[in-house]
Amino acid sequence: MVQLTKQFGKIKVEVPIPHLLNLQVDSYKKFLQEGLLEPLPEEGLESVFRSVFPIEDFNRTSSLEFVNYKIGEPKYDQAECIAKGLTYEAPIRIKVRLIIYDVDSDTESRTVHDIKEQDIYFGTLPLMTEKGTFIINGTERVIVNQLQRSPGIIFEHDSGKTHASRKVLYSCRIIPMRGSWLDFDFDHKDILYVRIDRRRKMPATILLKAMGMGKQDILNFFYKKETYILDNDGRIKWKFDPSLFRKDIAYTDILDNDNNLLVAAGKTITKRVWRQMEASGLEAFEVDPSTVIGQFLAEDIIDTSTGEILAESAEEITEGLIQTFRDAGITTFTVLHTRGNDTSSSIRDTLVQDKIPTTEKAQEEIYRRLRPSSPPTPEIAASFFDNLFRNNSYYDLSPVGRYKLNQRLDNYENATLRTLSDNDILEAIKLLTHLKDSHGPADDIDHLGNRRVRLVGELVENQYRIGLVRMERAIKERMSIQEVATLMPHDLINPKPVAALLKEFFGTSQLSQFMDQTNSLSEVTHKRRLSALGPGGLTRERAGFEVRDVHVSHYGRICPIETPEGPNIGLIVSLTTYAKVNDYGFIETPYRVVRNGYVTDEIIHLDASCEFSEVIAQANASIDSEGRLIDDYVTTRARGDVLMSAREEVTLMDISPSQMVSISAALIPFLEHDDANRALMGSNMQRQAVPLLRSERPLVGTGMEVDVAHDSGSCILAEGDGIIRYADANRIIVSYDDPNLYPEFGGVRAYDLLKYHKSNQNFCFGQRPSCIPGQIVKKGEVLADGPAIRDGGLALGKNLVVAFMPWCGYNFEDSILISERVVKEDTYTSVHIEEFEIVARDTKLGPEEITRDIPNVGEEMLSNLDENGIIRIGAAVKPEDILVGKITPKGETQLTPEEKLLRAIFGDKARDVKNTSLKVPPGIEGTVIDVKVFNRRSGEKDDRTRLIEDYEISLMDSKEQNYIKSITQRMKEKILPLINGKQLGTTILGKGKGEVLAEENSAITPELLDSLPLKKLEGAFKSKELNETITEMLSQYEKQINYIKTIYDSKRGKVTEGDDLPPGVIRMVKVHIAVKRKLAVGDKMAGRHGNKGVVSCILPEEDMPFFADGSPVDIVLNPLGVPSRMNIGQIMETHLGWAAKELGQQLNNMVEQGVAIQSLREQVKSVFESPEISAEIDAMDDDTFRTSVQKLKKGIITMTPVFDGAGESEVWDWLAKAGLPSDGKAILYDGRTGEAFKNRVTTGVMYILKLHHLVDEKIHARSTGPYSLVTQQPLGGKAQFGGQRLGEMEVWALEAYGASYLLQEFLTVKSDDVSGRVKMYEKIVKGDNFLEAGLPESFNVLVKELMSLGLNVTLHQEEGKKKPKRTGLIDKE
């Protein structure tokens, strides 16, 4: 059925939103490498195994090699795992090869002695469901993606905050994925230090020397050289080098080779003059001798006659040193070029600080810093240093780290190298010194180019690798201790360390979270969440403001709106609608390519660092029909700023206005009119909306509702084109046209619908079929709606008629006044399912028993239990009702002679047992909807178990018959065209004696084929070819039927075989109770714009304000909640919703009044004003059209996408079309008096949600209950059945009133005076109302605290002072 919807969006978005769960599902698929043929690429699980294997023993006499792995089929399906509390996992088997070598003791060469290959069971691996979740111990969990600092290189400075001189100190850090961190930093004296793994710092040149560089090599790499010439006449000339510009004052006249003056003495050498000097071929010119003093030698100066070193490289030049050169006949010397704007002597100064002469000593020094306890030998130190950065086993940059390092250092030679090369370290130091000398900008660590996402596949891969490394140690030890020649591979491999780590990660890791299953939206957003917390991430306390803030690089990647409000603000964020994560883990967003002002259809995805140089136009930039940008100047983003750019400069364009927000924010209509803080609350509160009994799509939507519903996994979607064979409330069977879809079932697929399924948050999740038998469906069409989904679109709340006005103070401070009609009609009623579990164990005193025979319990309490002591389905229960009767043996006491006699007469019946039955906890009142009984495999089954098993088997039998019937129908349809009208070559007999189904020579008709069993057609025709074709088709049919029977036989077997219960458990019973929660005073409700409030009063319908036509409003909100909050979107929604409702009702009235079909068509077209809708209307036949219009009875569904929605003028137009006031205000009348209110009131239709903060779940009362062990005061909180705390402020209030007796009562007998409590009870029973207070227990606690400080406190009663005698609480006069 075509749903007529009004689209207000003007921008045509060609690119569909990528599937919302792809992030999780694709990542785990890539990890498992599902469906790929061998040899597998070295990534995911394959790369983990390859990184650890082969494993050799210490003597290299044997080696264990990995061949391949296979993942088997899971033992239980998802539904069974949830019901039985199991993990949805599959077994993994690995094939390994053990090679044993003979080693020649002289040459140490190895020859293969023996090879053993074996398949080994390697534990299990949790599988991801198609919804992107994991089922761990029966609960659905989500692995949240982690946002982490990317491996690579980061350059930073301290902004002058570290040293007192306020000097800006630069530093750089090389971060690997695995291995030692390397930090370089300058101190205030410009000495460069290095830290390895944040240990004690040392001069950076020690590291360079350890790499094998000498002092001269270091100077040659970091510095250019200048050459000076010493003349015989005492002058110093500088050898002209065009690349080293000197902005000096000329010391003498500088002449060219033809004695033409280039620059006069005392004049400044400019760049123009420098170019003239270069052009003239000048070789050298005289310089001021004082400018040479203080420079540093580039090379050692050696006296050629004696071989003596006159001066070492890096030595500072002095006047004396120059005189020494002249005396020794040295005519030229080179110095380090340290005088430029971007060069300094810091590396030379560091070399002077560094007193270590050789590579060996440098390696030993590094070893001492990192391993202070053990003294090194040169060999150990060299091997240790080599392993630090050059060994794959200890150091891994990862492809991401290498990519970022190469990108930052602008060096792409070692694109595949995963370790750190010497060149990387040298280039990093070179860039760091350049940044320091030129005061260059530091990297922004909060830029998304420097933060990457670790997806679920990578997180599990890391855990698997850690487990394998632990296992590797154990294998090596086993190979060395035992005689390997006699062993098989399975003797060496124990997969337990891997299994333990996986179990810990999925069960307790900070990133493995209990799925938020409040509604379909909360499920999807939880899977798209990014967390900066978790192992290897930030902590709440340490994270500063910068890392939490919205960054310019977040645009189109991370939503600036959706984040929690508490201490996690900015640390937990959401992906935007179109964002994708690339292979390196960087978030990408799509853009359309723009060339010469023309927008092309080419789409590219860019990460944040690639986007920096682009000029990007917004999605709402005006374009003509040819795709050219209309405006000469357009608003663009470039280099982190918003600019006006000429259209020819634009290189890219956004693809959609909603690309910058997450799906939660994209569901808020008129988001552009809301303040960001309120939009944040709105997007967060939609995730808390409770699925209602009958949900309703919003009249004012954004178009995102359908995407969320389809991708959430809560709906059932058609996987191809086909026809519905069977549909009821529990099951839909579809026959697909594509023969490749489910070929084993003959293209027929059965979908079982969820009914009364308990979600993680205890809500009732169910699916409703939205198709009928015989209906033709297209691929992607919705077959069944899920929870909070209606007609294939998200439906979290209800459309209510709202009035913004004060009403007797009942909407003070965001309170909400609501009509009783809403409660009466179950508009906001939701169903919650509570699960209760009880186990009968084998105790030391004997087994516990689930029974109806419970001591000291009256028959009335047992009335709803069956003969086995288990509650019957359908029973209405309230607090303290028994759900399952259970007795537990008590400890045997010394028996009296009478008890011994009773025991002798009645046997075991008289033994001591206590009642440990499962009872309904306080605050729960509902109906039992399901009971599951789990028995030990070998244990006896009671009648209830057998009854449940019989019911489940009968259910499976009927499902099997339905399935077979649908496949048979499909096969008959395939055969009919071949045999229609063909004559039978034989008589077909029925089962009964002499029963004839079809005579020989009779022609086949569709009716006859329907009445014949398919088997009877085999060889029944005269044509041999036809018989062969039919035989072949029937053999396929037989295979399909047998396959289905095998599946259902296996399911029936599982029902009757018993269960795997934990050790010591005999029987387990689970009871599900459905609780109906109607809207009540105290429930929290909210709109989509952050406008939230609590229901303060439910008013009778007749007292509510009403319109002139007598229809009352549903809800009254406070108008003061709008201006200060600045969420004007709610007013726009209210007005548009009113117009949509009125227009829908008017069109429906026209149908009911029998208006001519043609004029009705024209009217509908004029309302929608859309060529696409007009074409759809013209294509419909009259009946379909009428039905489509009648569906608009409750209102026209409108789509107003974020940042591209309906403007004010369009809302006014729609109000005018509906015949409503253009300002959206109406005269309302007081329901109590019938008089009109003084002013006109803003009214309309708003979408209101009921949130998961229900008063019934929060409120509780206590008379007596549990007390704290130490203080003897009542516990706190509903979960502990605690009481109210009377704190300091309450005591002050009572003191201020002088209510001393009341205060004494509160602080003693009503709280923690144990003996006083008992006495008070006794006195109340006797009718003596006299308060006799003793010492409160908390006073004793205080005394003990003081004693623990060494102060002995004793209490004395003073002599002669007697206690005052009183006869009652009030002295009698």
Curated annotation (Swiss-Prot):
Pfam families to which the protein is assigned, alphabetical: RNA_pol_Rpb2_1, RNA_pol_Rpb2_2, RNA_pol_Rpb2_3, RNA_pol_Rpb2_45, RNA_pol_Rpb2_6, RNA_pol_Rpb2_7
Known catalytic reactions: RNA(n) + a ribonucleoside 5'-triphosphate = RNA(n+1) + diphosphate
Entry function: DNA-dependent RNA polymerase catalyzes the transcription of DNA into RNA using the four ribonucleoside triphosphates as substrates.
SUPFAM superfamilies attached to this UniProt entry: beta and beta-prime subunits of DNA dependent RNA-polymerase
UniProt record similarity statement: Belongs to the RNA polymerase beta chain family.
An annotated GO BP: DNA-templated transcription
GO molecular function list: DNA binding; DNA-directed RNA polymerase activity; ribonucleoside binding
Subunit field text: The RNAP catalytic core consists of 2 alpha, 1 beta, 1 beta' and 1 omega subunit. When a sigma factor is associated with the core the holoenzyme is formed, which can initiate transcription.
InterPro entries per UniProt: DNA-dir_RNA_pol_bsu_ext_1_sf (IPR042107), DNA-dir_RNA_pol_bsu_external_1 (IPR019462), DNA-dir_RNA_pol_su2 (IPR015712), DNA-dir_RNAP_su2_dom (IPR007120), DNA-dir_RNAP_su2_hyb_sf (IPR037033), RNA_pol_bsu_bac (IPR010243), RNA_pol_bsu_CS (IPR007121), RNA_pol_bsu_protrusion (IPR007644)
Cellular component GO terms held in the UniProt record: DNA-directed RNA polymerase complex
Disulfide bonds: none
EC number of the protein: 2.7.7.6
Source organism of this protein record: Lawsonia intracellularis (strain PHE/MN1-00)
Protein name as it appears in the record: DNA-directed RNA polymerase subunit beta
Keywords for the protein's UniProt record, in alphabetical order: DNA-directed RNA polymerase, Nucleotidyltransferase, Transcription, Transferase
Keyword Hydrolase part of the UniProt annotation: no
Highest taxon above the source species: Bacteria
